[in-house]
């Protein structure tokens, strides 16, 4: 075979007997094909994912990662060796069967979390989402360099403006959820089956476990160019939506089990019909709400990409904008409907639960067919389930607090403080994750000061992540003031807006977000150093901690206000 540069390659394939049983000599001449295009075609058939050597790490010049060679030029044979080393696929199967043999990447990647993006071969999410490739020719040799995508530079003002609108939208969504919860707390199912209150933070926390994780992961994929191809984009979307339905169903069921146990421990009473109602309500709510929010989230990500807006700034807050309201409304409606059927149509409640649980194998099959989500079906449950348990503890605090008639005013503010804190910390975690994907490799941190992650390091410094932490913290007080007065103008809640109430509430909100941003700085870098994708691991923990911190600080605030005499005025009644 002769290419356009005069190189001759003859491919001899042994075949059956022909003219006396010799070999068949296949010689192809491709004089019309340019060598660099032909090489580009070959390389595009096999995605390249590889790890830098120790001495090659962090060598970067003008946005181009160097491979540690004396020149930027690599021959095709050298590149093939890298393919063989890091993909370990069968060459015979690849050529003879016109497909990829089942294989895995280097063992070094086995601990990297969750997803693989390389045509069905097992890899990690973090490694697969590294640099895109750029193939060029110097006119004499075929040179291959890898170009690192860069985020557009953002000033603090531009960043604040991009965050402000979705932040306010998300805030009004949580305010609406708080007002709905303030109303439905008087419904019969909430009064007779108080364990439903334990479900509230756990199910609302699904937006942190699933929706915000999906938003952050797809935002990172957009920023590093992994959604430029339509096929790759829809593989990511369909696989992630199917996976999310599996997780929502399982987490919804486990949240109900946790609510049953946590509700049984204080009083020692157990009711089978209440347990079935909790399981059915939780599973149905998680499934329906997750599906609706997932579709909305995909639209936001794709729309952000087309309009040139950084999805890291808008995707996670919009993921939560109506998430709380949708989830809470569905939970209240389904649980009240099933409760009204307990005496006359007792079989409806278990049938509802069984129906949604029976759909789980279908979603598992769909998710397993997409390489981007196959691995997480086995290894991605730890953060989701742990976050659910943390949120359920916050629900127990809420259930205990609302049992006191003097502290019922906490209900309307719980979704607000929890939602705002979770939204802001999810934005920061998503931005740090994108920064790490663009400036370092999994398991290695970029050139930053070593040592403990103390608050001064998080909020003060020249880095872009320091700047975003400052902007997010500054949004807390004006944002909460807007939401407090919105609740007041809507005549909702059971608490008068006194000066001391506003001061105590804002102190709790600022302390919550300050703590979460500090923890996020450490946690995202920690998971990256461990080779785990922070988009999938950190956000569930952070939003769950936001629920726990928000509920606990709010409960302490209301206890403090009661002790000093600033008590409820039954405004909402």
Curated annotation (Swiss-Prot):
InterPro entries assigned? SLC41_membr_dom, SLC41_membr_dom_sf, SLC41A1-3
- A Pfam cross-reference name: MgtE
Q: Which residues lie on this side of the membrane: Extracellular?
A: 1-162, 217-245, 304-313, 369-376, 428-469, 520-543
Task: Provide the reaction this enzyme catalyses.
Answer: Mg(2+)(in) = Mg(2+)(out); Mn(2+)(in) = Mn(2+)(out); Co(2+)(in) = Co(2+)(out); Ni(2+)(in) = Ni(2+)(out)
Answer yes or no on keyword Cell cycle. Answer: no
Q: Cytoplasmic side of the membrane: what ranges? A: 184-195, 267-282, 335-347, 398-406, 491-498, 565-573
UniProt KW Oxidoreductase keyword: no
Which compartments is it annotated to reside in? Cell membrane
- Give membrane topology per the record: Multi-pass membrane protein
User: Could you tell me what this protein is called?
Assistant: Solute carrier family 41 member 2
Q: Which organism is it from?
A: Macaca fascicularis
